[in-house]
């Protein structure tokens, strides 16, 4: 993997529980690392993520990344690769950006090896503080399968509130799944504090001067 290329697309860097984590703008250079996780952890990820079934080759991953970057260039999506020591371990994103309703949805996933280490929570915490001003977003939503207990911890720990439960919201793995929707009014947010040290010292405006300032997890 070309670490020089990754460095050129760094969004933010922070520390969580003593480990250094980077969020990079999604790039083709991440495709092999991301697909390796999907390939190894396919059964686990497919329990909650319908797109895993369609991710059958490295070519599929590269095609998705190309699609994502095109949407980001149109400010329809904002997707980041979670890296630990520049190794891809997962993704977070803001998708379904609705400028009329001033709201958007958040998606995320991470390798089992890196769960429960604060990378997703701290990454989203940084993202939530920055992104709303760019997209004029007032409301963020997270949709979660009612049985995905680990995933529910993320919005709750960040101050999101459960707004509604929808029966038979999605069909995958041969059955219907009920979902819970968690919401956060970003102008009134009270994001829970977490131990995290930011290394990248830039003003918000600098974050969006990246030449391909792209605006999902695969949703």
Question: Which residue ranges define each predicted feature?
Answer:
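Short loop/turn motifs at secondary-structure junctions and domain boundaries
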Residues: 70-75, 160
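Residue-level detector of secondary-structure transition/capping positions
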Residues: 39-42, 53, 69
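Acyl-donor (CoA/ACP) binding surface of acyl/acetyltransferases
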Residues: 1-33, 37-44, 79-219
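A short hydrophobic/aromatic micro-motif that marks alpha-helical segments and, especially, helix-coil
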Residues: 56-57, 72, 190
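Conserved GNAT-fold acetyl-CoA-binding loop/helix
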Residues: 46-66
């Amino acid at each position: 993997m070309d670490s020089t290329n990754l460095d050129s697309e760094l969004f933010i860097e922070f520390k969580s529980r003593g480990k250094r984590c980077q969020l990079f703008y999604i790039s083709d250079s991440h495709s092999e690392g991301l697909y390796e996780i999907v390939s190894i952890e396919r059964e686990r990820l497919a329990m909650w993520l319908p797109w895993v079934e369609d991710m059958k080759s490295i070519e599929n991953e590269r095609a998705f990344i190309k699609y994502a970057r095109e949407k980001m260039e149109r400010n329809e999506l904002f997707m980041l690769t979670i890296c630990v020591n520049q190794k891809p371990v997962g993704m977070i994103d803001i998708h379904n950006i609705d400028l009329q309703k001033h709201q958007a949805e958040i998606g995320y996933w991470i390798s089992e090896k890196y769960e429960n280490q604060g990378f997703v929570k701290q990454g989203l915490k940084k993202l939530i503080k920055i992104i709303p001003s760019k997209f004029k977003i007032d409301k963020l939503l997270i949709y979660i399968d009612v049985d995905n207990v680990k995933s529910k911890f993320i919005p709750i720990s960040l101050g999101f509130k459960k707004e509604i439960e929808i029966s038979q919201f999605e069909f995958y793995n041969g059955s219907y799944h009920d979902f819970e929707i968690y919401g956060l009014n970003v102008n009134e947010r009270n994001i829970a504090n977490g131990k995290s040290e930011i290394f990248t010292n830039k003003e918000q405006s600098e974050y969006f001067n990246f030449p391909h300032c792209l605006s999902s997890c695969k949703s």
